[in-house]
């Protein structure tokens, strides 16, 4: 299949090939043509049209048979893609079987064709996204377990706080992925529904056969028949867009963390290296986080597109002017961006390059200050909370002012040495002994992932 796109320079970077195929022009046409073929089979099943008309119609429902450029030019006059496509479909069928042509598109309207065609595309997109989320979850689970006990500086407000583990940080990314999978599972039955209402949503053109045809069509396309047509009730699509927005944001968080850890001043975690990857056109030494950039870019762009979907919700009466049209490129673009971000997230996470020694060095950049809380907690049990906190605060200030390690300052402080032995101080100022429940959080996140996958 030849993909038609105006963004060939960027698509390989921002979009997964598999998703680009779903939403290329041929993919859109095939979704609509699948609706028309399914409609013919459904109407023949209930006896509304002759069975002999089905084969000629179905045989003409192949996207490769149509001139996309000609259809695109016609849309500017027709106002939607279904009108010129149905005309071209009828013309092609008539050239082979004039009798069958009269049964094309019977009882349907343009929006039925386009919305159901879109849902069929979204079904394919949903499978791709779910598959990538599972794969990403598997990778993150493995990495979280691998680095479950690897200490690093926790950072709050972009400053060193207390020690955490790299595994705990990765487990946080994993938890967001797991929740996104759960949301997609929950919305799937609401999203994958038939659109079939005819001109104004009543299916009046089909008379008493309307509901039997709708039921048969839903069965043909393996979609759910909703309680009624949803021409101007767009919450299903907006819900899907919203969940994709959450996925994009979660991936952006992952990308932001990795990019910050790749900074020269941190240099703790890196994207996988490859020839020509992350270089500069002028600076030979550069190793840029090009994968993380895609995640952050998607997290920046997708919310605006989701906002467009929300803005398009108050559609007029039974069929909308302009608001429906605003969805056409928006939702596919959201899918494309999320797919590209997921693809990059998997590649980056699989090949993470970690420098535990650098993490250890960075933990000691503040010369023990990141463990001040650990000492304060123990002293509070012996001196009282306020006294201990004030004492540690003064010791920390002295350590900074004098350029000394907190361990040395504390050892010189009579109130501290009276309560804590040298051995106790050494243990309290060892990051490996102040990781709290970090390992537990890793175990819980990994367990949750695999329970959702089973």
PLM features per residue range, with description:
Residues 51-54, 266-273, 343-362, 389, ...:
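A glycine-biased, small/acidic residue-tolerant capping/turn segment at secondary-structure junctions
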Residues 301-385, 391:
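Long, amphipathic alpha-helical stalk/connector segments used for oligomerization, subunit docking
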Residues 233-268, 276-335:
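A conserved active-site cap/scaffold subdomain adjacent to cofactor or substrate pockets
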Residues 145-167, 269-279, 285-286, 317-326, ...:
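Glycine-rich cofactor-pocket loops
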Residues 39-42, 64, 129, 133-136, ...:
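Amphipathic alpha-helices that form helix-helix packing interfaces
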Residues 2-204, 209-214, 277-280, 290-294, ...:
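A helix-coil-helix interface module used to build multimeric assemblies
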Residues 20-24, 70-72, 277-294, 316-333, ...:
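Short beta-alpha connecting loops at secondary-structure transitions
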Residues 212-231:
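A short, charged helix-loop
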């Amino acid at each position: 299949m030849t993909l038609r796109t105006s963004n060939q320079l960027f698509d390989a970077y921002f979009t997964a090939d598999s998703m680009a195929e779903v939403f290329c022009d041929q993919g859109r046409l095939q979704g609509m043509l699948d609706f028309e073929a399914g409609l013919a089979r459904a109407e023949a099943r209930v006896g509304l049209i002759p069975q002999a008309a089905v084969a000629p119609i179905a045989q003409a429902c192949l996207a490769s048979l149509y001139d996309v450029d000609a259809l695109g030019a016609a849309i500017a006059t027709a106002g939607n893609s279904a009108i010129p496509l149905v005309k071209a479909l009828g013309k092609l069928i008539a050239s082979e079987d004039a009798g069958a042509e009269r049964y094309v598109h019977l009882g349907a309207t343009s929006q039925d064709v386009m919305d159901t065609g879109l849902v069929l595309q979204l079904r394919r997109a949903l499978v791709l996204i779910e598959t990538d989320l599972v794969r990403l979850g598997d990778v993150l689970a493995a990495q979280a377990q691998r680095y479950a006990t690897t200490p690093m500086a926790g950072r709050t407000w972009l400053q060193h706080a207390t020690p955490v583990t790299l595994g705990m940080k990765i487990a946080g990314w994993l938890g967001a992925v797991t929740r996104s999978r759960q949301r997609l599972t929950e919305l799937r039955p609401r999203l994958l529904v038939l659109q079939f209402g005819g001109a104004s949503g009543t299916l009046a053109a089909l008379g008493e056969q309307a509901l039997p045809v709708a039921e048969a069509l839903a069965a043909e396309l393996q979609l759910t028949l909703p309680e009624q047509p949803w021409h101007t009730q767009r919450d299903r699509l907006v819900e899907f867009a919203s969940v994709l927005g959450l996925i994009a944001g979660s991936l952006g968080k992952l990308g932001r963390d990795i990019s910050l850890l790749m900074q020269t001043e941190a240099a703790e975690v890196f994207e996988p290296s490859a020839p020509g990857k992350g270089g500069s056109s002028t600076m030979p030494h550069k190793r840029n986080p090009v994968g993380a950039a895609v995640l952050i870019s998607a997290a920046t762009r997708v919310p605006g597109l989701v906002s467009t979907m929300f803005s398009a919700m108050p559609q007029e009466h039974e069929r909308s002017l302009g608001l429906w049209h605003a969805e056409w490129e928006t939702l596919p673009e959201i899918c494309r961006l999320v797919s590209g971000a997921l693809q990059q997230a998997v590649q980056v996470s699989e090949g993470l390059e970690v420098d535990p020694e650098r993490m250890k060095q960075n933990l000691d950049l503040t010369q023990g200050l990141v463990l001040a809380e650990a000492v304060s907690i123990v002293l509070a049990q012996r001196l009282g909370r306020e006294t201990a906190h004030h004492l540690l605060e003064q010791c920390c200030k002295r350590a900074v002012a004098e350029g000394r390690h907190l361990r040395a300052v504390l050892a010189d402080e009579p109130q501290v040495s009276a309560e804590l032995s040298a051995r106790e101080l050494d243990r309290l100022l060892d990051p490996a002994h102040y990781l709290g429940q970090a390992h537990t959080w890793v175990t819980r996140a990994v367990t949750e992932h695999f329970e959702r996958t089973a």
